[in-house]
Design a protein with these regions (language model features):
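Short, amphipathic alpha-helical "recognition" segments used to contact nucleic acids or chromatin
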Residues: 42-57
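Short secondary-structure transition/capping motifs
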Residues: 14, 38-39, 52, 66-70
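Glycine-/proline-rich flexible loop or hinge segments
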Residues: 32-34, 57-64
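Short, well-ordered secondary-structure "scaffold" segments embedded in the functional core
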Residues: 42, 46, 62-253
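Terminal low-complexity, poorly structured segments
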Residues: 8-10, 59, 160
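Basic, low-complexity segments
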Residues: 1-40, 124, 181, 247-252
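Short coil/turn linker and secondary-structure boundary residues
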Residues: 6, 17-20, 58, 69, ...
Length: 253
């Protein structure tokens, strides 16, 4: 029993989670009945394997060696649970208009070059739009855009994030989103930003989204996405769910 407890604890550390977050995810996923051949590992351990893959970005061979399973089993677990975690994040999303939001874009390096392009980081990347709540860095929505060599407004327009921002009314953004009416951006005069007290206050508040993106990229899968490009949206949703769980359970012990 002691050896089993130590093993679970080591798995939790590797997945950067704790028993409470793991129990929450398992309870949410255990309600849906699944047909087909039963899994050789329980749901709790499969969730740990999927979280470890997102957090560490280990290869299938390395995951199989750590959890003592076959490579095909490790691949099936990650490929099956990642979309379910992303769907759980979309179900749990509850926009709150009491607090201001912040939107920004970031680059996700990808190995699949079909939907990616060389961008300012000199790597093939895809653009991801992130919408967070300024108060606690809770991710309201996250979307996978197109090639990373295009500006943020190109990916923002027509996305679900734009629909949410139009209904909110208090969304901060940087100067790259200039001209979008529903966003609060710095004031320009003569093609230059007016660096006054309003701009300094806006800069301090908008910097919170950079902190949120940095925390999201603690999950190393967003630093080098090795899966197919069409799986990037599910990966982003799963990471957003795990990030929001850490924020929610931290504020409500």
């Amino acid at each position: 029993m002691t050896l089993l407890t130590m093993t679970i604890d080591h798995m939790l550390v590797l997945a950067a989670t704790n028993r409470r977050r793991l129990a929450f995810v398992v309870n949410q996923l255990s309600g849906a009945l699944r047909r087909g051949r039963p899994w050789s590992r329980p749901l709790r351990e499969r969730v740990l394997i999927a979280c470890t893959a997102l957090r560490t970005n280990l290869t299938v061979r390395e995951l199989a060696a750590i959890f003592q399973i076959s490579k095909s089993t490790a691949h099936r677990i990650v490929a099956t649970l990642t979309p379910r975690l992303a769907a759980l994040a979309r179900t749990a999303a509850r926009p709150d208009r009491r607090w201001s939001w912040i939107v920004d874009g970031t680059l996700i390096p990808t190995r699949d070059h079909v939907h990616a392009a060389k961008s300012k980081n000199y790597r093939y990347s895809c653009n991801a739009q992130v919408l967070v709540r300024r108060r606690d860095l809770h991710v309201i929505a996250i979307s996978a855009g197109g090639p990373g060599n295009r500006n943020d407004p190109v990916h923002y327009r027509g996305s679900q994030i734009q629909v949410l921002c139009k209904h909110h009314g208090r969304v901060l953004a940087d100067g790259g989103y200039r001209g979008i009416s529903e966003l609060v951006t710095p004031v320009f005069r003569g093609c230059r930003i007016v660096r006054d007290a309003v701009w300094r206050r806006h800069r301090r508040r908008r910097a919170r989204v950079e902190h949120a993106i940095g925390r999201l990229k603690n999950w190393r899968v967003l630093r080098d996405h090795r899966r197919r490009g069409h799986n990037l949206a599910d990966t982003l949703g799963a990471v957003a769910l795990l990030h929001n769980l850490s924020v929610t359970l931290r504020d409500n012990p």
